[in-house]
Amino acid sequence: MSFKDLREFIDHLEQKGRLKRITHPVDPAYEMTEISDRTLRAGGPALLFENPIGYNVPVLTNLFGTPERVAIGMGREDVKELREVGKLLAYLKEPEPPKGFKDALEKLPVFKQVLNMPAKRLRKAPCQDIVWQGDEVDLDKIPVMSCWAEDVAPLLTWGLTVTKGPNKKRQNLGIYRQQKIAKNKIIMRWLAHRGGALDLRDWMETNPGKPFPVSVAFGADPATILGAVTPVPDTLSEYAFAGLLRGSKTEVVKSISNDLEVPASAEIVMEGYIDPNEFADEGPYGDHTGYYNEKEKHHVFTITHITMRKDPIYHSTYTGRPPDEPAVLGVALNEVFVPILQKQFPEIEDFYLPPEGCSYRMAVVTMKKQYPGHAKRVMMGVWSFLRQFMYTKFVIVCDESVNARDWNDVVKAMTEHMDPVRDTLMIDNTPIDSLDFASPVVGLGSKMGLDATIKWDAELATRPQISKQDSKVITEADLESLKQQRPEIIDIYLPPTTNNRFAVVTMKKDQAGQSQALMEYLWDFFAQYTDNKFVILCDEDVNARDWNDIIWAVTTRMDPDRDTTRVSGKAESSSKLGLDATNKFESEVTREWGTPIKKDPKLVAKVDEIWDQLGIL
């Protein structure tokens, strides 16, 4: 199953009941976000808004709003088949020569796929049916979405940004958010380690002061779009990978104003340049973390040409607290990552990036442990092997018998097999996502590795295993009494698999230092009943019994080193870790804390009024 362009993909989804056309007039300012968010959270279809208020261009959202649609876009029938995509990428990253004639025959299907890799260059293409240039260039004619009430400006989200470094043979495709600031100008927000930013850096070194050519394509075929978000080897272009997924060469055409090649079937293409000396303040925007980010200086992209197909479709999305479309993509791409990691670390049984952890800030790994210290080697491997995991703050490693995708199973392993202080690896001053406001410094923070594997004798030398102790039953009456003694406590959850040695507590936090004081009180309380090892403190907006809420709070509101309390063990009791996943007061941190995204009640009520008319679900 493959699709030559976005329109063919739309037709297929519509035939299968996976896309809904919305004929009711809908405003790109906020309304589309609210409708798309409701639809995605309900596992609903892709949406094609045919009558955006004030515009003649339809808007496509929620295209990859379920893992199944991501798999279909990659030419697969089922999400599980994405493991085969990962195996192919692992092979291309480190190809093995055939061991003989029989092995060569077995590898023949792979070689045939590789033949589809080079892009096919066209002289004319649908994406250049209509051309705007000079004063005709006008972003106000395109229904760019405004997503959240406190966003600074409309935001372009799904553009495939095409760049080429001066010393590179191939182009780079990347997806970066872009703030609209004028009819012909947007701010290009790309992080320093991303391909586009690296190409610009190299360009400025070899062509100081000269404009850097850039093209941005919206609405390419699904294989090309997904190729831009997949961890392809550095030696393989995204166009080539898209050809592998599709089973046919990716058709491209040279941009009108520069030498960059863009997808021939793209709906809309923006061409222009970045002046190395032109910057602007980007943000704040509500982001995939569920918070508004800080302002940052980024380069400005000046658009000199806009080309498009006849009757173009504008492809867009929104980002917000998981689940959103990036989180769904993360769930699907997780299956691609597993074989790539297993090629380098065959001992890995499973690898899971929970979407509630913003799809990259936490990883759970299960493995076949073969020697002392093996779990820590795997932690280091996760952090260093793929660029995608550079910003993963927490890595939990468990034995192969543990279900990495079941939090009750994971915390059971943590309480049974960890001495928390001994088996926790903390690394300071490591690269961190600049959107992570919990880090002490922009772009720099700590990482935590938790070894929840069964320990070998050598690993017990510094801290012998504490013999299992019987736990007294903690009754609801006991917990109610605790709440009366500490009225700031909202709820207490003791996961049933942890024998009362793991607690999640939500609280009403009123002042700095309050969470640390409560943590100490809780350990004294639990000591009456059990050898408690872990306490996680969260704010009252978190449901203590919902792992989605808990993991989201841990990954967005903690710097692991600063916000973890360590208590050394005693002869008769284990060491302890306290994780403070509460929002921090100004005196507790060194930079501005994030503001959570909140929906506008008036907007919600307005969409409520038309929801049934839309007939989406």
Swiss-Prot record:
Q: What class of enzyme is it?
A: lyase
Its BP terms in the Gene Ontology are: ubiquinone biosynthetic process
UniProt keyword annotations, A-Z: Cell membrane, Decarboxylase, Lyase, Membrane, Ubiquinone biosynthesis
Q: Could you tell me which InterPro entries the record lists for this protein?
A: UbiD (IPR002830), UbiD-like_C (IPR049381), UbiD-like_N (IPR049383), UbiD_Rift_dom (IPR048304)
| Biological or metabolic pathway of the protein | Cofactor biosynthesis; ubiquinone biosynthesis
Q: Name the predominant localization.
A: membrane
**Subcellular compartments:** Cell membrane
Q: How does it assemble?
A: Homohexamer.
Q: What is the protein name given in its UniProt record?
A: 3-octaprenyl-4-hydroxybenzoate carboxy-lyase
Which species is this UniProt entry from? Vibrio parahaemolyticus serotype O3:K6 (strain RIMD 2210633)
Which gene produces this protein? ubiD
